[in-house]
Amino acid sequence: MKLMTRQIRTSLKNCHSDMQLTLEDDINVPDSKPDIEHIIKIQGEIHVQETSAETDRAIIRGQLSFSLLYLSDVDFRQIHTMQGQIPFEESINLENANPDLEVHCHYDLEDCRASLINSRKISVRAILSLHCCQEEEHILAIGTGIVSDDAVQAEMGDPTPPAGVEQQLAPMSVTTMTSHQKDLFRIKDETSLPKGKPSCENVLYYELSTQGLATRLVDDGIRITGDLLIFVLYTPEDDERNLEYFETELPFDGIVSCSGCHEDMVADIEIVPGKKSLECRS
């Protein structure tokens, strides 16, 4: 008699590790910027540029980009801003890591703050949480029935067991991976200042974030919708002594190509924020 089997392809977690990373550096104020009297706010973003696996460890390379809003002692205009970066390269212990397999790294910026060393130097400190894992593809043989030797020789598809042999079967639900990919979804839009707001000369500080982010499968694609929240602090034209701010929301709706998918499938989608930029135009 023979055990009939069916092969199932699956991904199993090979290894994983969590750690906290502290980034800290002293940053000089650029020569073109006035002295710092008081720090108002700092905003940081993490950009992971490369992840690679080595034997029993993972290497993460990236940088912390920050924007600092501060108060100066200049009478002409007291509010100023400066930007900077802190590069990092970290080795994470990852037992049983395979150098030939891809490493997946998830990260969160838990804290980012700045302190004043002197009027021309600040200390920037950030805490970054990292979760790294590696998955390996396996092929499993699942038993589907027992057939007699005569049935095997006759190439009969009936899985009825031979006399004297009992079998117990249970249904098992499985899914098949249709697509596994990475892609970029770019949001590029523009908005006008409302009436009553002066024109923008220079952007001092801005914040961009998403709200109500939702994904839905469509035929051969993934639909992404949400709102982009915008806050801008700027100096107006012909009046650099004063400051103006502007807040608004911009809806976005777009489709990322994903060949072979449709709305009846089950999706496992992860969205990671990328680079942000904002500029004023006349």
Predicted regions and their residues:
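Viral structural modules
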Residues: 1-282
